[in-house]
Amino acid sequence: MALGRPSYRGGRVSGGRDPDFAELSSSLEQDREIFHCDVWNSVVHAVSLWEAGRIDRSTAAGIVEGLVTVLEEGPDRLPEDAEDVHEAIESRLHEVVGEEAGWLQLGRSRNDQVATSVRMRLRERALDLSRELVGLGRALLDLAREHAEVPIAGYTHLKRAQPCTIGFWMSTYAAAVARSARGLLRVPGMDECPLGCSAFPGSTVPVDRHREAALLGFRKPARHCGEATALRGPILEFLGRLATAASELTRLAGDLIQLCSDELGVVEPPDELSSTSSVMPHKKNPDALELVRAELTVVAGLKGLGDAVHGKLPMFYNRDLQVLNGLLWDSVNRFELCVRVLRKVVEGLDVDEEAARGTVLGSHAAAVDLAELVAERAGLTFREAHKVVGRVSARLDREGVPMSPERADRVVEELEREGVKLRVEEVREVLSLKRTLRRPVEGSTDPGRLEVTLDRLRAELAAAERLEGTWRGRIERALRATEAAVNRLGVEGFAEVYRGYWDGEAPG
């Protein structure tokens, strides 16, 4: 499709673009992500120009009505050889309404335009991500509550360390998920509107930036025009929080892969989220978890690429920042899909409680409790008791004797060799699974304490859900306010069409 007027070329730069440069510079495909936000952005700017007395009512109405048409048509009707979505929308608008479209960019640069549209879309995607994380968090809490008292070995350095429960293990990840669900909605600067900053020093047109911010659902205008257009602090902060969440969920995927190994066999993912071998008919492989682990690793790595692109750029705006937008949407898309898959895996997990108990039985995982008993009863410092129990553990391990209640008498014999005398009954008690799970501190694996923790985490997820609702309510009120503003121009239907994009039911 030929590029409709007006193109940004034909003034200081004449002629067409070199085809290789055109391919390099085009961001149209990634800009589909912000298409509807950019139209809303433009509608509000047209209203602002009218309210500032810079264009008349008829011109403003024609522009806004044309923008509603562009929104209804969808991104597939945009010129394919435009440099970006901003040029494409303006060009298509010119085809729809004629020369009046040329007034739209008065007092606005692509710099504040793209910064605003990206924040608007990122806000929408953050709300969706938070909702998905809340769903995953609740699935983890349901799993944790169901198996709150089922013992399993906790590992450090991939060696059996101390007993905990399946509930404690899964709730550890639920706690991280709850933090991320809130954190993605609390990125500094996300609720500040760059519109009106122009290229970087501020617009020469006296638009009401507070009014623009309110109509677009922001809490306030960005406080510094240069920072809002030249830097990408909120995007990098968001990528950082996404990377942290991704790295934590990578570990969840890895743990589940390990727990479903033949050697442990504690969990098994559902068939619909597993694969088989092309040659070995007996295999059931956790492919979904392996792919999630890899994809989330990419998400974590994209933050570093974003820093590399952004870092060392001179003030103020540089075209390099276009690449950063692509990294952002790539991260968001990968992350959202992985969270959905993880939730389905967690909801469909089959847990073998006996296999979980088997990871603790026959081990020396209660050695810490024994060392504390030795320190208390024998009058040794903990460091001295630590060494005593360490030597006992080494000898028993060489002989293949577990540090278990059933072999408490053997443990007592070895302690006596170290000059420590304890009763078999008290050693048997401290080595029992029930006893080793009792931890009298807040947030511990103790089943009673864990129940309190699970309730608290469920409340945190509910708080994240309320925060999401608050944000969605603000956007909806802004959409209604924008609709009221364009109604004053005699134009109707903008909000209804926009909601279709927000609900994922838009054309294109």
Swiss-Prot record:
InterPro entries: Arg_succ_lyase_C, Argininosuccinate_lyase, Fumarase/histidase_N, Fumarate_lyase_fam, Fumarate_lyase_N, L-Aspartase-like. It is found in: Cytoplasm. One of its GO terms (cellular component) is cytosol. The keyword Lyase applies. The keyword Amino-acid biosynthesis applies. It comes from the Archaea. It catalyses: 2-(N(omega)-L-arginino)succinate = fumarate + L-arginine. One of its GO terms (biological process) is arginine biosynthetic process via ornithine. Pathway: Amino-acid biosynthesis; L-arginine biosynthesis; L-arginine from L-ornithine and carbamoyl phosphate: step 3/3. One of its GO terms (molecular function) is argininosuccinate lyase activity. Keywords: Amino-acid biosynthesis, Arginine biosynthesis, Cytoplasm, Lyase. It is an enzyme of class 4 (lyase). Its EC number is 4.3.2.1. SUPFAM superfamilies: L-aspartase-like. Its main location: cytoplasm. Belongs to the lyase 1 family. Argininosuccinate lyase subfamily. This is Argininosuccinate lyase. It comes from Methanopyrus kandleri (strain AV19 / DSM 6324 / JCM 9639 / NBRC 100938). The gene is argH.
